Structures are given as C-alpha cells and as structure tokens.
Amino acid sequence: MKILTLAAILAVICIGCDKNTVDVNNPDVEEFVKQLKDGTYNNYAWTEGGERLWPVMPAFDRDDVPALLALAEDTELISPCDHFPVNPLSSMYPWRLVGSKPSIMLGEYLLWCAEAVIEGQDFASLNPVLIDEIRKPDQRLDSDEILSVRKLYQDWWNANGHLDNPPSLPLDGSGYGWH
C-alpha cells in the first residue's frame, strides 16, 4: 500500500513537471510567451546525430490568433533572444541592437506569428521585422508604430477572422510589410 501511494505521488509530481513545456503541436500561447520572456523556451530541431539546430516554431492555428494579437500589445525588448523560433532559411539576424544587446520586440514577433497563421504558412516572411515600405523602408518600426500595426491586425481579424478565405491580408494597402 505504501508503495502504491508513493508511486501515485511520484506520478503526480512528474506530470506536474511537464506543464512548463510548450507542446509545439498543440501550443498554449500564454505559456509560449512566458517562456520567450523568461528565456526558457527550449523546443529545438535536432540532427540525426543529436546536434541541436534551431528553435522550432509552435504549430499555432486560427484559434490562437486572438491570443497572439492580444499579447502583441507588449512591446518589451527581450534579450537574450537566441531561443526565439525564427525562419531557418533567413540569413539575417532578426533582432535589434539595443546598446550592444541583441533584442527582439515581443509585440512585433507575435504579430509575425499571427500573420503566419493567417497566411497558412510556417513563417510569415524570412524575418519577424516590420517595416514602413513607403516612408522608411530601410528602418524598423518603433513601439508606437508596432501598436498601430497591431490595431490594423485586430480590426482585420474582427472583420475577417471568421472567414475561411478572407478577401485580403491584414497589411494589404497599409504601407506596412514584413521583411
């Protein structure tokens, strides 16, 4: 009887340990964001030889878009940022240098995740970098501009999120685009 009780307690403890891992096939957006912020996201692609490659993007779906857009109001710059899943095909580093620290703006990154879901792609572009294609095509957006773009996404989602084949994408005609 004591062995069964001990086994049950250990099972509960072990099950509780897994709650801090993001299931990339059925992700929890809030847990993903928490892990990005505290630097503990650790789902990586691996070689057959067991070498770590790059962080794997969770398989977000349309049900996750409202949470991604809601959490995109956070324009905190996160550093270190080497645990952020980015497009492995890109040769550009997606972060901003703040002082001498590479950082990723969380809100911009989450909008990029939402755009990928809306487009039905693994990644929205090569890089999670928003630009104003008309006025400042060679500069990244600042936090106020990111929040303006977030409003475009929210308005678009409210009007089109229920459609299987929306007539446009959130940034169409806005002058903003993904790098």
Place the predicted regions along the sequence by residue.
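Generic cytosolic/nucleocytoplasmic N-terminal low-complexity/intrinsically disordered segments
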Residues: 1, 18-19
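Sec-dependent signal peptide recognition
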Residues: 1-8
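C-terminal motif of bacterial Sec signal peptides marking the signal peptidase cleavage site
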Residues: 13-16
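Extended repeat-based scaffolds of very large eukaryotic assembly and lipid-transport proteins
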Residues: 20-179
